[in-house]
Design a protein with these regions (language model features):
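Short basic helix-loop element that most often maps to the first helix and adjoining turn
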Residues: 32-49
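DNA major-groove recognition helix of helix-turn-helix
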Residues: 65
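Short, charged recognition helix plus adjacent turn
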Residues: 92-97
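Short alpha-helical DNA-recognition segment
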Residues: 45-62
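N-terminal flexible/basic segments that precede or flank functional cores
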Residues: 1-34
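Amphipathic alpha-helical interface surfaces
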Residues: 28, 32, 57-60, 73-76
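DNA major-groove recognition helix of helix-turn-helix/homeodomain DNA-binding modules
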Residues: 74-90
Length: 97
């Protein structure tokens, strides 16, 4: 064992990201992907059918469902959420000082 101090993080995103801004974006992408995945599961369709419904290829949907979020921009996920019939709302507040 080493005597190096243990670093703690507020969330998994803070641990993975290099900056707080990047962590926030990763968290938002994960939330959108989870909601889209839940919507797709509720359709009871094959991945190919669900992908067609979303306007993407089956391999692309598979990436989304497997959590390969680095392959999706926030904009793309927002568009997919809308195609999945989800209402995406944005709330803007002042950050804590």
């Amino acid at each position: 064992m080493t005597d190096e101090p243990t670093q703690t993080f507020a969330s998994i995103w803070d641990a993975l990201a290099e900056t707080p801004d990047e962590a926030a974006t990763m968290r938002r992408r994960a939330e959108l992907a989870l909601a889209i995945g839940q919507a797709v599961e509720g359709w009871n369709l094959s991945q190919s059918q669900a992908a067609a419904r979303l306007g993407i290829t089956q391999p692309r949907l598979n990436d989304l469902l497997r959590g390969r979020l680095d392959r999706f921009s926030l904009d793309t996920l927002m568009a997919l959420a809308e195609r999945a019939g989800l209402a995406v709302e944005m709330r803007i507040t002042r950050a804590a000082a």
